[in-house]
Amino acid sequence: MEEKKNIGEVTLGYGDGPLRKIGITDMVRCEFADHRLVTVAYTEEDAYLLSVENPQSSGRATQTNMYLTEGSAAALFYTYILYLEHNGTDANELFKKYILDDKEIKYEFSPKD
């Protein structure tokens, strides 16, 4: 399999542990009307960096990140949808409310080779 070219890198670490630089090979970033910035980046370790950045004025955490394997990312999304369905929330309606009705989403994809 052909090795993908890095388009950037991210520094990962936790607490007092060692920091390490990981190459990003693919990504998509969406900016929503409320200036929330959501990024899904695929890394050279075959894992995903999921990031949500909020404006300071939102009162929410300014940045939240998760670094997950493909299996863990799939399990997270599946469990979220399962939770919604269990509580009587239609996932498609929820996505429509927050995503499809937002006419001002700006998308940025990494370039394809």
Predicted feature descriptions by range:
Residues 1-113:
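Positively charged, low-complexity terminal tracts
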